[in-house]
């Protein structure tokens, strides 16, 4: 995984650098260049460039996001409270859109990163191009980002540097149930984000004056990608640790370098690359290096390095507390519920792959669903380390039991086998998702049935 993520990081950075140089050729100011890099990172992570339909949607969404982010940046500078309202609404909308399927969810994910960067990089009007070109430039940069991300990814896949794009098949496990009293998870997470960001802006504007940005930034990062309240608490710890280390290194570097000189720009780009590369290993790495990049981009102002570091850490801790409080107190999403749903999705994919009636059986869909299970596993494994001695069974054990089935499942699918005993065990495991006490035993039985047929 480490080598694949490194290759993806290299391809993403090549696209980002090419787009950045194109933007600088049009306007030497730093604003469009920063926007170019951010849009490339967002597009690469959304994977909308992987197919024609996604590229068409990105061609519409990216320019809109680009223009909107600059508009919000202007509002935050000249009308802070109005800018805060628009920022909160936009971020919450990007989460609420998850309810409309995979493609819309990926398009909504484009909103986040450009809006995050404007928190630490204030809008500066361009002075080197005409007013008309300044209005068109965000759209031009967005389309350049789409062009170069698509070109580099297509070339990398053609050269077999990256694997062919895979899209998870839509298999309906059980329709989400919603009511006016208990909305579905995406709606609850959107409400949580709206409440958290609103509190962060109010606390920042009222009590911290010019220091509000990092409070809002941390609140968003802790709550983004919410996979349940345990996940938010886990990420808040990683965010504080990673951001603290990142801020420390950024501060030490700026003591010996001038803000925004060539060396600083090189370190910013290197930090972004390493953050993309190591993100699949742990969120802590992403938190560390994205904080380092943003801190170098923003620079430091203060009477002493020690005071700047303590103030920045104070802002990060306050933002993390707000994010965790919203996740646990405002329409909380149970982490075990998220995990059970993702395990059920994986079992549905496995059942489909081992169904004799399925014309084309392949392991990719099951593996992609299993990847989604593994994304929520770190928080549960950390919880198991702390509470393992007090519990005989832990949800992290469910993940381990399912992962133990991976190689056996691949062998059965690739060999075209559909043993009845295994299919029966899969059915029993899917039924056990309704009874947490039975899940571990059912998954262990599934593993034993697979072992006897491989």
Model feature map: region roles:
Residues 290-293:
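Membrane-spanning alpha-helical segments of multipass transporters and channels
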Residues 223-226, 296-300, 376, 380:
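A short secondary-structure junction motif
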Residues 281, 297-304, 354, 433, ...:
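Conserved NTP-handling cores and scaffolds of large molecular machines
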